[in-house]
C-alpha cells in the first residue's frame, strides 16, 4: 500500500473516514488471502467476507482495542458514535457502530500516513486468524 494523497483527516467526517477505512481493510484482507491461498476468486470472496463483515469487524475491534493509543481510541469512539441511518442486515446495532468506529480508525491512520501502524494492527489481527501466516 502506497502513501495516500495528503488529506487532513480532521477535515473529514467520521463516516468519510470510515469509508476510506473500509477500503483499507478490504485491500489488506484481499491481498493477504490472495497471497496465501490458491483458490478461485469466488472462494476468495467467500473467505474475505469472514473478515470484513460488520460482525467480524466488531470482533476484530474487540481484540485490538486494548492496543489502541489514547488518540486512536478517541478516533474509534468518534466513528462509533457517528449518526447512522441504517444498520447491517446481519449485525446488531452495537456491532455495526463498533465496526464503523474501527473503519474510521483505519481511515484516519491511513490518511495520516501511519501505514506502519495500520500494518502493525492488521498483522496482530491476522495472527489471531492464522498464526502460521505472515505478511
Residue ranges and their predicted role:
Residues 1-135:
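Double-stranded RNA-binding/processing signature
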Amino acid at each position: 500500500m502506497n502513501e495516500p494523497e495528503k488529506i487532513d483527516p480532521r477535515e473529514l467526517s467520521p463516516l468519510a473516514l470510515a469509508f476510506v477505512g473500509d477500503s483499507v481493510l478490504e485491500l489488506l484482507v484481499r491481498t493477504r488471502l490472495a497471497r496465501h491461498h490458491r483458490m478461485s476468486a469466488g472462494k476468495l470472496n467467500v473467505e474475505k467476507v469472514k473478515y470484513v463483515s460488520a460482525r467480524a469487524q466488531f470482533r476484530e475491534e474487540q481484540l485490538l482495542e486494548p492496543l489502541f493509543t489514547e488518540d486512536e481510541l478517541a478516533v474509534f469512539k468518534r466513528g462509533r458514535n457517528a449518526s447512522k441511518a441504517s444498520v447491517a442486515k446481519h449485525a446488531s446495532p452495537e456491532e455495526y457502530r463498533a465496526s464503523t468506529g474501527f473503519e474510521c480508525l483505519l481511515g484516519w491512520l491511513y490518511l495520516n500516513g501511519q501505514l506502519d501502524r495500520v500494518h502493525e494492527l492488521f498483522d496482530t489481527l491476522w495472527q489471531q486468524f492464522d498464526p502460521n501466516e505472515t505478511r
